[in-house]
Amino acid sequence: MDLPGLIHDFLLVFLGLGLILGGLGVVLLPNPIYSAFSLGLVFVCISLFYILSNSHFVAAAQLLIYVGAINVLIIFAVMFINGSEYSKDFHLWTVGDGITSVVCTSLFVSLITTIPDTSWYGIIWTTKANQIIEQDLISNSQQIGIHLSTDFFLPFEFISIILLVALIGAIAVARQ
């Protein structure tokens, strides 16, 4: 989306705050229904980020797959869980929460200090448009594949990491 700089920056900050608040809601809200709706907010904000970066196909796929399927499935599964077991024995803060907070905060600080010092020349070099062959000689699905492996490589990898974490979490919950 081609927006003036000030409006674009405002929308980025607004969506970033939505992501942060939604992520905190997923983790901190004791009711699983509210956590699932917060996860839906996170997915919608990510989709809007993709729209701001002019990747409309990835935004549509994000909305259809994550909000339309995964989040609805999570809400449907949570509806069958007995809600009374979550309300009893609720402790505001435990030792595990403290350890997790320290680990997440240290990881966040290390990322914040590492990312500005990283040379992104190699990543920018692989996403140059002149490396892509003639656009007229390939089909639309091949163009999507080329863009996913060049221009949208990092978002594609982030999505695969999120799916891996969700799979590991589902296995851990199923084993208990």
UniProtKB/Swiss-Prot annotation:
Disulphide bond pairs: none
Membrane spanning stretches: 10-30, 32-52, 61-81, 92-112, 152-172
Compartments it resides in: Plastid, Chloroplast thylakoid membrane
GO cellular component, one term: chloroplast thylakoid membrane
Keyword flag NAD: yes
Top EC category: translocase
EC numbers: 7.1.1.-
Pfam family, one: Oxidored_q3
Keywords: Chloroplast, Membrane, NAD, NADP, Plastid, Plastoquinone, Quinone, Thylakoid, Translocase, Transmembrane, Transmembrane helix, Transport
Coiled coil: none
Family stated for the protein in its record: Belongs to the complex I subunit 6 family.
Assembly notes: NDH is composed of at least 16 different subunits, 5 of which are encoded in the nucleus.
Protein name in the entry: NAD(P)H-quinone oxidoreductase subunit 6, chloroplastic
Organism: Lactuca sativa
Phylogenetic lineage: Eukaryota, Viridiplantae, Streptophyta, Embryophyta, Tracheophyta
Gene: ndhG
